[in-house]
Amino acid sequence: MAMAKGLIFLGAPGSGKGTQAVGLAETLGIPHISTGDMLRQAIADGTELGNQAKGYMDKGELVPDQLILGLIEERLGHKDAKAGWILDGFPRNVNQAIFLDELLVNIGHRTHWVINLKVPDEVIVERLLARGRADDNETTIRNRLLVYTEQTAPLMAYYQEQGKLYSLDGNQPVEAIATNLEKLVKP
């Protein structure tokens, strides 16, 4: 049996990683797995994991890694993920990456590529301010970028050491990024 082709998308808020992950998933015919969407769905469906997650979220706490990994394991067990998958929003730190690697080995999957969309901070600030969300002001955005950079720098180094990290210029037209992604991942 061929091993599933696993892709992880990294990028700061506003980098376009969600847009690109969804587009590439459609092109390749594999699922785009957003941990945020999965959590919301599990809560809406009233699953055991969803109810546990809701308990943490209602208290304003982060959902524990093991709970998220449970959701990911369940999702990767679906038939549509056998040929591959794109994970968006997880892992966010090295501990999560190590847990994820162990989980993937246990279920016969592996990460082939970790794709990082690089976009200058100034461009991200402009993009997020242009969205016009109530909670998006320049100070908040810059703080989120700082936290993101601090959290993900060690994660990038982790995947770089494994030879899996590919950084792409995310400061170009959506179509150009999509073309570059397809060239990278298509055999």
UniProtKB/Swiss-Prot annotation:
Keywords of this entry: ATP-binding, Cytoplasm, Kinase, Nucleotide biosynthesis, Nucleotide-binding, Transferase
Any GO BP: nucleoside monophosphate metabolic process
Keyword ATP-binding: yes
UniProt keyword Glycoprotein present: no
Annotated region (LID), positions in chain: 130-136
Pathway named in the protein's UniProt entry: Purine metabolism; AMP biosynthesis via salvage pathway; AMP from ADP: step 1/1
Catalytic activity of the protein: AMP + ATP = 2 ADP
Annotated region (NMP), positions in chain: 34-63
Main localization category: cytoplasm
Subcellular localization, as worded in the UniProt entry: Cytoplasm
Residues given in the record as ATP binding sites: 14-19, 131, 172
Signal peptide feature range: none
Example of a GO MF term: nucleoside diphosphate kinase activity
Binding-site residues for AMP, renumbered to this chain: 35, 40, 61-63, 89-92, 96, 133, 144
Broad EC category: transferase
InterPro entries: Adenyl_kin_sub, Adenylat/UMP-CMP_kin, Adenylat_kinase_CS, P-loop_NTPase
A cellular component annotation (GO) from this entry: cytoplasm
EC code: 2.7.4.3
Domain remark in the UniProt entry: Consists of three domains, a large central CORE domain and two small peripheral domains, NMPbind and LID, which undergo movements during catalysis. The LID domain closes over the site of phosphoryl transfer upon ATP binding. Assembling and dissambling the active center during each catalytic cycle provides an effective means to prevent ATP hydrolysis.
Protein family per UniProt: Belongs to the adenylate kinase family.
PANTHER family in alphabetical order: NUCLEOTIDE KINASE
Subunit structure and binding partners: Monomer.
Protein role: Catalyzes the reversible transfer of the terminal phosphate group between ATP and AMP. Plays an important role in cellular energy homeostasis and in adenine nucleotide metabolism.
Annotated protein name in UniProt: Adenylate kinase 1
Organism the protein comes from: Synechocystis sp. (strain ATCC 27184 / PCC 6803 / Kazusa)
Gene: adk1
